[in-house]
Amino acid sequence: MSQLTLTLLMIVSAYLAGSISSAVLVCRMRGLPDPRSEGSGNPGATNVLRIGGASSAAMVLFFDMLKGALPTYLAYLMGIDAISLGLIAIAACLGHIYPIFFGFKGGKGVATAFGAMAPIGDDLAICLMASWVVLLLISRYSSLAAIITALLAPLYTWWLDERFTIPVAMLSTLIIIRHKDNIQRLLKGEESKVSRKKRPKNP
């Protein structure tokens, strides 16, 4: 099989894997409202945190990251070049954003993108997660944390393993484009902050 054929197959596979909406499936399994029509309307971990609590959000985060990490890492093991790895990672993110199995209504692609970056190395994964968590705790804006972390990701990659700087920059660009509405709301002071679902108190 030629490198081009293998790359195209991995791009299609990555898109299909990305199209499996973890948020919708976890909410269905746990009897929670559909995240596409509840809260912010975004089927991602942050919105599931709002409507279902931390454990449900953690499940969504894990599986969304896995959707990006698995196809990208498999392609890397197959010897696919760095730029093609970036295209495969973008395909996984586009599957998450425009899922063929869920009416093409998906999330922002942040967890899937960061999951695709994580196999580059534990050090990069730690830098990404630490940046996102610290920025979220400081600002309470999930979107702002994602945007700034996306901007930092190519710099981290260049510092740690410059071979993958361009693919990571491609993913970061996609994340920022996907957050254009959030950027406008942040500038207007209209963006919603993250808050956990409040559990009813026992009588």
Curated annotation (Swiss-Prot):
Residues passing through the membrane, by range: 6-26, 82-102, 118-138, 141-161
Entry keyword set: Cell inner membrane, Cell membrane, Lipid biosynthesis, Lipid metabolism, Membrane, Phospholipid biosynthesis, Phospholipid metabolism, Transferase, Transmembrane, Transmembrane helix
UniProt membrane topology term: Multi-pass membrane protein
Record field: catalytic activity: an acyl phosphate + sn-glycerol 3-phosphate = a 1-acyl-sn-glycero-3-phosphate + phosphate
This protein's name: Glycerol-3-phosphate acyltransferase
Record's function text: Catalyzes the transfer of an acyl group from acyl-phosphate (acyl-PO(4)) to glycerol-3-phosphate (G3P) to form lysophosphatidic acid (LPA). This enzyme utilizes acyl-phosphate as fatty acyl donor, but not acyl-CoA or acyl-ACP.
Biological or metabolic pathway of the protein: Lipid metabolism; phospholipid metabolism
BP-aspect Gene Ontology terms: phospholipid biosynthetic process
EC number, UniProt record: 2.3.1.275
Domain of life: Bacteria
Subunit structure: Probably interacts with PlsX.
Species of the source: Shewanella sp. (strain W3-18-1)
Main location: membrane
One Pfam family in the UniProt entry: G3P_acyltransf
Localisation per UniProt entry: Cell inner membrane
Native organism taxonomy: Bacteria, Pseudomonadati, Pseudomonadota, Gammaproteobacteria, Alteromonadales
An example Gene Ontology CC term for this record: plasma membrane
Family: Belongs to the PlsY family.
Alphabetized GO MF terms: acyl-phosphate glycerol-3-phosphate acyltransferase activity
